[in-house]
Amino acid sequence: PYFEESFAKAYIEYNPKEANRLLDEMGLKKGPDGYRLRPDGKRLEILLEYEDNLETPKGKTTEMAVHYWDAIGIKVTPKVISSSLKSQRTSANLIQFGLWHADRAGFLFTTEPYYWVPIEVRSEALWCVEWGRWFASGGKAGEEPPAEIKKVRENWEKMKSAMDEKERVRLGKEILKSNAENLWTIGTVGLAPHPVVVKNNLRNVPEKGLWGWDLRRFTSYAPETFFFKQK
């Protein structure tokens, strides 16, 4: 109920010419190798660390992103790391650039909106490590977020206890609108097909469905009723 087409289409135009113009305007000049330079004269390089688990094809997504950034002179180096190392580096706020599939904007929006609202320090919520630490510690640690992020958090607090469904949906849309407008995270692919392999004689499995953490994968499709048809 929180989806708006404008959220999905925000900043999706592929326009390398405009991207180059904006980077030039920022003063990020290109060096002799074609890559852009930082203000100190060194090459601008970004380390993209991610956990290539089975939930989404992060490797393929990363390849495309690296290619697009390279085309405008930004050097991005992808690196696959383990889940445990990712957690350690996230907690220490050492990850420059990360990647994770975004969900929890459905049934779990009011309880686990980790990719849209700073809640705490989590290895999946790479976009708001120090803001999450600030909220979780009551302002004793981390970095105090800007007013817009405080408003996002405030809307979520109201959303959690909203008894009126229309008000809850309105608040949820305000949160997602802030993300779409401010690009707290950079979206890549939305609603991509997710094939599921099913053995020929397994029955009661739906041909089509929704796949995501919000639905606990196929839990909502009553897997307890699946059965193998005997010959």
Named regions from a protein language model:
Residues 1-5, 17-20, 56-66, 86-231:
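Detector for C-terminal structural segments
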Residues 43-53, 76-78:
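Short, well-ordered beta-strand elements
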Residues 50-52, 80-82, 190-192:
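A mature extracytoplasmic/lumenal domain signature
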